């Protein structure tokens, strides 16, 4: 059987362009959370903000393997061993992966059983090898440098966490050439919209 491939940041950005064209959309505001922050910034840069009226990123690093001072991602400075230790269990030990992942993305109070079941079910809709391919490409892709191409209004939301940190959002907003807003969350964790 053929394994899925091509699930990259760039390909996802191209999918957005194709969907906007297919639906005949105008005046689009794109929002990307977590890894998808990199996808929407990649779209804006690659397609010169085609049909965009605004851009929003929520708690997502734009270059996880970067050694920059704003980057607190566990893959910082090409820490491949940490990436392998953190993400490969998705393939060979899914329960271990989800236990650690959910603890990392939840707010301080944790996640109740009903929300956890929903969250895991949503995550499992993507095959492990496809998810790993996309996440690895996300870590390798420098979308921080693409922020200087952004001229549409830009809002960045960030949560205080070890994985990301709030200095990241200030740096991102400072890089864009147009209007920007920063929104910081101090207690909600990576899933800020859920709590």
Model-derived segments and their meaning:
Residues 67, 72-73, 89-149:
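Conserved alpha/beta-hydrolase catalytic His-Asp/Glu region
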Residues 41, 45-46, 51-89:
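Flexible "cap/lid" loop of the alpha/beta hydrolase fold
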Residues 193-195:
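Post-His helix in hydrolase/transferase enzymes
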Residues 151-189:
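Conserved loop-alpha-helix segment in the C-terminal half of the alpha/beta-hydrolase fold
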Residues 1-35:
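Active-site loop/oxyanion-hole signature of alpha/beta-hydrolase fold enzymes
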Residues 33-45, 50, 54, 63-64, ...:
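A structural preference for long, well-packed, hydrophobic secondary-structure segments
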Residues 2-6, 66-69, 167-168:
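Conserved catalytic-core motifs of eukaryotic protein kinase domains, centered on the activation segment
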């Amino acid at each position: 059987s053929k394994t899925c491939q091509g699930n990259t940041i760039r390909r996802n950005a191209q999918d957005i362009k194709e969907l906007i064209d297919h639906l005949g959309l105008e005046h689009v505001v794109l929002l990307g959370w977590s890894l998808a922050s990199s996808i929407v910034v990649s779209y804006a840069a690659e397609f010169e903000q085609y049909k965009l009226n605004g851009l929003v990123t929520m708690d997502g690093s734009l270059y996880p393997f970067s050694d920059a001072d704003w980057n607190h991602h566990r893959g910082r400075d090409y820490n491949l061993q940490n990436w392998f230790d953190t993400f490969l269990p998705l393939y060979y030990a899914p329960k271990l992966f989800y236990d650690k992942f959910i603890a990392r993305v939840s707010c301080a109070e944790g996640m109740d059983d009903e929300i956890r079941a929903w969250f895991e079910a949503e995550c499992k809709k993507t095959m492990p090898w496809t998810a790993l391919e996309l996440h690895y490409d996300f870590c390798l892709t420098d979308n921080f440098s693409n922020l200087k191409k952004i001229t549409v209004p830009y809002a960045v939301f960030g949560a205080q966490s070890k994985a990301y940190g709030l200095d990241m959002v200030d740096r991102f907003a400072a890089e864009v050439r147009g209007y920007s807003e920063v929104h910081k969350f101090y207690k909600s964790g990576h899933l800020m919209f859920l709590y």
